[in-house]
A protein has these predicted regions:
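Bacterial N-terminal signal peptides that target proteins for export
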Residues: 2-15
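Bacterial N-terminal signal peptides
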Residues: 13-24
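Boundary at the C-terminal end of the N-terminal hydrophobic targeting segment
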Residues: 28-30
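Beta-strand-turn-beta hairpins that frame and shape the catalytic cleft
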Residues: 41-53, 211-221
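Cys-nucleophile CN-hydrolase/nitrilase-fold catalytic domain and related Cys-dependent amidase chemistry
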Residues: 73, 77-174, 181, 247-263
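CN hydrolase (nitrilase-like) catalytic-core segments centered on the catalytic cysteine
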Residues: 121-141, 217-319, 324-325
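Active-site catalytic loop in hydrolytic enzyme cores
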Residues: 150-240, 252-253
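Cysteine/selenocysteine-centered motifs that mediate thiol-based redox chemistry or coordinate metal-sulfur cofactors
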Residues: 195-236, 315-376
């Protein structure tokens, strides 16, 4: 609860956000997130069958270059060349999916150094990719480390961008949550989970699991792995194609999630140098149907572009011929779900800029303090 005496001392922007958070906490579900009759919103399909292409490639870390600008230019050129290749080989793509970090790669060091190895979305890089999307008449999807100096100063964001056929950013998908309990470190990036209240106040509940309704089907993009509840929520919201970006992943997870939720799915993984300890986990990108059957796959750790034509008209027809989402036994499981207490509370990165953890080790300390399960 916001105390009246504290209002006068708040900066205008902070006051507005605080009031929005207070309002969102009292107005439960002001918008309809799931229709009661099992239907979901969609736009008419431009065509019955849609072509998805998935790119897997080796990305160089920006810190490996003499300067960040040189690194971005190199990685952007690589993305451009792969996009042109995807547009000129095989069938014309309607969607081109890249991996989690094709522009930035990874970064080490303190937060201030990691922030240098990020991009803004939209920004110069999405503008350049937008020209390619427009020329190819395709959607381009990719993940990236990103920053937002206006709304989220000091935070390292993990975003998935969708660039439309018109060359503009159509949607930005935040990472829902991070995997926990790595050992000596925790991932210090900002997700919906760890700034939940401010996120909802700023963007609304619809953006917790946003759905981009396109002329080729309802899509969403996610970087989370082995997280069935997240994907069930997306399915309830009407997702028909689940695009996934990763650095290392579980093939069975992709197949099972698609089968459980009756949607198409595509996963793009990066590749690693052959002498890397992670080389065995590189590549393996795939596209699966709503039963989890593999439609296209490259099991190697090599650069590749795979493609599959998917029947969106048949998917819609097959969903009980009434635009129905999958069936979930919510009433049966709710008594258990209602009593489950997550180990880590929401909003654990809703702290002042100077208190944001500087490294994975510092994030580990913060998370251990926040844990509801560990002995204090």
């Amino acid at each position: 609860m916001i105390k009246p005496k504290s209002l006068a001392s708040m900066p205008l922007q902070t006051l507005a956000l605080a009031l929005a958070i207070a309002a969102s906490s009292t107005a439960a579900h002001a918008v309809t997130l799931v229709e009661k009759d099992g239907s979901y919103a969609q736009v008419p399909l431009e065509k019955d069958k849609v072509v998805i292409k998935v790119v897997q490639n080796l990305t160089r870390n920006l810190q490996d270059f003499p300067s960040i600008d040189e690194g971005l230019a190199h990685n952007l050129e690589q993305m451009a060349n792969l996009t042109k290749r995807a547009c000129s080989e095989g069938k014309k793509p309607d969607f081109i999916l890249f991996n989690e970090f094709p522009l930035t790669g990874y970064s080490d060091g303190p937060r201030v150094e990691k922030l240098k190895s990020t991009i803004t979305i939209p920004g110069p890089e999405t503008d350049a990719l937008g020209k390619l999307a427009k020329a190819c008449d395709t959607y381009i999807i990719f993940g990236s480390y990103a920053r937002d100096d206006v709304d989220w100063p000091g935070h390292i964001l993990s975003l998935n961008a969708v660039i439309g056929r018109d060359g503009k950013v159509a949607e930005k998908f935040w990472k829902t949550r991070n995997i926990k309990n790595y050992g000596d470190i925790e991932i210090p990036t900002t997700t919906i989970e760890n700034v939940y209240d401010k996120y909802v106040a700023r963007y609304g509940e619809e953006e917790l699991f946003p759905v981009l309704r396109t002329e080729f089907g309802n899509i969403a993009v996610s970087t989370v792995q082995n997280d069935p509840m997240v994907f069930a929520a997306y399915a309830m919201r009407g997702v028909e194609i689940m695009f996934r970006t990763a650095t290392l992943f579980n093939k069975l997870d992709v197949q099972a999630i698609a089968g459980f939720n009756n949607f198409y799915s595509a996963m793009s993984n990066i590749t690693f140098p052959t002498d890397s300890p992670y080389a065995k986990g590189g590549g393996g990108s795939l596209i699966v149907d709503p039963r989890g059957q593999v439609l296209a796959e490259d099991p190697s750790n090599d650069e590749a572009i795979i493609e599959a034509e998917i029947d969106m008209a048949a998917l819609r027809k097959g969903r009980n011929k009434a635009r129905h989402i999958p069936h979930y036994p919510m009433a049966v499981v709710r008594p258990v779900f209602d009593q489950y207490v997550e180990e880590f509370p929401l909003n654990h990165l809703d702290v002042a800029i100077d208190q944001l953890p500087d490294s994975g080790a510092e994030m580990k300390v913060l998370m251990d303090k926040q844990s509801r399960w560990k002995s204090k």
